[in-house]
Regions:
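TM-lumen/periplasm interface segments of multi-pass membrane proteins
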Residues: 18-100, 335-353
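Alpha-helical transmembrane segments and terminal signal-anchor/GPI-anchor hydrophobic tails
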Residues: 29, 35, 54, 59-63, ...
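Transmembrane helix irregularities
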Residues: 50, 170-173, 284
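Transmembrane-helix signature of polytopic, membrane-embedded enzymes
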Residues: 108-127
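Short acidic/glycine- and proline-prone juxtamembrane loop motifs at membrane-interface regions
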Residues: 135-140
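Membrane-interface transmembrane helices that cradle and orient dolichyl/undecaprenyl
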Residues: 147-160
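Membrane-interface alpha helices of multi-pass inner-membrane proteins
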Residues: 161-185, 202
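Signature aromatic-anchored transmembrane alpha helix within multi-pass, membrane-resident enzymes
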Residues: 197-201, 315-336
Length: 353
């Protein structure tokens, strides 16, 4: 566990410097800022890129790289990526090294570029378990690289670029198409209370309609295996506590942040919509399969990048510090418990270095 703690601490420190722009009143050059940004990426890249048998699906990806002909359920875009890497080397370590560089370099860079407190965003990436999950479902996180950039483009008002990036993500992992929902909701004018009501209605309708939806998924999609194998076991073990945390977060920000910011400020809107979508996904997962909550990862970037924007809109500094501390403690405790109980197979950590 110490390797994760030290790696996170170093990354957060360098991210703080990279986004500070100046130290002791002295403005830092762009070159120096980029250097600190690079240093912030290195701990995650080294930890994940040199790992051996760390991550629940590590062995599966290793076999995929060695024998791609054995695997038929991965998308053509992802398999093309694998074939390109195999043309360079048949050693699966290359796969884990390159995917780690792509995933963590993109996240840190986007955090520095988008977040009002990049250090918080990077820390949140770890304590929300996303870093550990990224060493498991690598193909989905490779798709999320495009989703993170799509989020950035959406905030800048470049909707078509955001949609294009979403489609590129879907070429790697088709489930990435769910991000289109955030794009649509982001462009529609509405009140947060009305959106919350709509989400609640969708959840109720979805739970009632799962008995009709599941047979369709099993018969017509490649995700049917999640309803008839060990994936369908222990449905509520992960989603329930995470659902409660997000519900508390949503209720808290509604009471402590002026609704005009949540409805008009682009970063706050993206955050609020993402939280509501994650609540909806986790509620719907109760009637589907435990792995349905994996859709929430596509909106985790928006939450990590723009949570600081919401916190900064709290006019009462005491409330802001209390909420920030509570969020950090809740997620840290939750993720630590999961990792210590061998969730994501992150422990014991092993590296070839």
């Amino acid at each position: 566990m110490i390797i994760y703690i030290l790696g996170t601490a170093v990354s957060v420190l360098f991210t703080k410097i990279a986004s500070a722009k100046e130290i002791n009143g002295k403005k830092l050059s762009k070159g120096l800022l980029r250097t600190f940004e690079l240093l912030a990426m290195i701990p995650f890249i080294l930890i994940a890129g040199t790992r051996i048998d760390v991550g629940t699906d590590y062995a599966a990806y290793e076999q995929l790289y060695l024998h791609p002909e054995w695997f038929t359920h991965f998308s053509e875009g992802f398999m093309l990526f694998v074939r390109i890497l195999r043309s360079v080397s048949l050693n699966p370590r290359l796969f884990f090294a390159i995917t780690s560089v792509i995933i963590y370099a993109t996240f840190v860079h986007t955090a520095v570029e988008e977040s009002e407190c990049a250090a918080f965003s990077v820390l949140f990436f770890v304590i929300s378990e996303d870093f550990f999950v990224s060493m498991n479902i690598v193909s989905q996180f490779l798709a999320m690289v495009f989703i993170w950039r799509a989020t950035s483009e959406l905030i800048k008002g470049r909707v078509m670029i955001s949609v294009a990036l979403c489609l590129m993500a879907a070429a790697i992992h088709p489930t990435a198409l769910c991000f289109i929902v955030l794009i649509l909701l982001f462009k529609i004018e509405y009140s947060i209370k009305r959106l919350a009501t709509v989400v609640a209605v969708i959840c109720a309708a979805g739970i009632g309609g799962t008995k009709y939806l599941i047979p369709f998924i099993v018969r017509y999609s490649r995700y049917g295996r999640y309803f008839s194998t060990h994936y369908a076991v222990n449905k509520f073990s992960v989603a329930v506590p995470l659902l409660l945390i997000y519900v508390v977060i949503f209720i808290t920000i509604v009471f402590l942040v002026d609704l005009k910011f949540l409805e008009k400020d682009s970063k706050c809107r993206a955050f609020t919509i993402s939280v509501l979508l994650n609540i909806a996904i986790m509620v719907l997962s109760f009637g589907l399969t435990s792995n349905a909550y994996r859709f929430t990862y596509y909106f985790g970037g928006s939450i990590a990048f723009y949570f600081p924007s919401v916190l900064n809109k709290m006019q009462n500094k005491k409330n802001r510090y209390i909420v920030e501390a509570a969020v950090l403690v809740l997620f840290t405790v939750w993720t630590t418990m999961l990792i210590m109980h061998h969730n994501q197979n992150a422990l014991p950590y092993r590296s070839f270095l």
